[in-house]
Curated annotation (Swiss-Prot):
It catalyses: 2 (2E,6E)-farnesyl diphosphate + NADPH + H(+) = squalene + 2 diphosphate + NADP(+); 2 (2E,6E)-farnesyl diphosphate + NADH + H(+) = squalene + 2 diphosphate + NAD(+). Its cofactor is Mg(2+). Pathway: Terpene metabolism; lanosterol biosynthesis; lanosterol from farnesyl diphosphate: step 1/3. It comes from the Eukaryota. The keyword Cytoplasm does not apply. This is Squalene synthase ERG9. It is found in: Endoplasmic reticulum membrane; Microsome.
Amino acid sequence: MGKLLQLALHPVEMKAALKLKFCRTPLFSIYDQSTSPYLLHCFELLNLTSRSFAAVIRELHPELRNCVTLFYLILRALDTIEDDMSIEHDLKIDLLRHFHEKLLLTKWSFDGNAPDVKDRAVLTDFESILIEFHKLKPEYQEVIKEITEKMGNGMADYILDENYNLNGLQTVHDYDVYCHYVAGLVGDGLTRLIVIAKFANESLYSNEQLYESMGLFLQKTNIIRDYNEDLVDGRSFWPKEIWSQYAPQLKDFMKPENEQLGLDCINHLVLNALSHVIDVLTYLAGIHEQSTFQFCAIPQVMAIATLALVFNNREVLHGNVKIRKGTTCYLILKSRTLRGCVEIFDYYLRDIKSKLAVQDPNFLKLNIQISKIEQFMEEMYQDKLPPNVKPNETPIFLKVKERSRYDDELVPTQQEEEYKFNMVLSIILSVLLGFYYIYTLHRA
């Protein structure tokens, strides 16, 4: 009932939710004659582990869909081992360091997780994953094995790092390195898969900073949002170099008297996350295939919406905050084009600026960072130039010009969805008016 009320109070979001549910046709389907029962089981596991992420993966082009599904499940298996405190220490380290070697086997599974571990099915049913993994092209297998090895060793290193376990992340550099192992490596692997599939220019992988920023922007947003939940669970990922400028201890921000200091710290962390936005937009401009673009764009627009939500928001210090379901539907539909993504970023950057107080210690730095992003977005399209002034053909302008051809191909689809929605709405309103007319006749 609460979600329905939310939608009713936000008609644009209600329209987006209805269009997403009833008018949009997925680009691709997972169900065809060649889908094996093992692969279908992998899709079931994917749905069990992450409903939202599963929905985006299922609509990927068939060339990428299966390998991205397996890549996600394999990394989820690693996460499940790392997070389970019931696994004996030495066994856990051994499993993490050598997990990539399990991918060479045709049969292997693990049932050593505690019974209440959420995603243990990924490990108990790992043989289904292995069967499908060995059907992938060798170049896809190689990428997944390499990233699995790097991530597994990174996880093991953090478990063995006594300073990290006692004191958490110390410097901003430590923060970036941690986010690299958790999310940057995923961006590395996915970018290589996309380039191998020829769904983006090869230059996309030549600039490490671009795909690194794709992962770091998402991870840093989640870390800021999850402050309260992580502290309750006995974890902390905010870097001391930043939070120690505002309080002696990280948990001090929960105290009412330190709330404003906590907000200043949140805003400082948002400033740090915003440093990745230009790279994110540059990366998105380099993707050609539509389903791959949507797969990459949706998490990024959700991240900027979440950053705007957590900015200067005291609720972050005391509980969980989430963007509305209706907002999610709206963002999914609008982010299907690069221009739509740019408009989303522009909207939420203005939202952040509107909540920025002059008293904020980072007032000037935040304004400068947001202005840099806004100038970059203007450079991407240059469609506000005076008459007879030619655009400056910068690398990003030319890249966006090429991407715009693919955006234009989506226009008929969007128009058809709008037509379907308007037709259905007209029919519903006509029926309701008809019933109302009959009702008034009987009353008379």
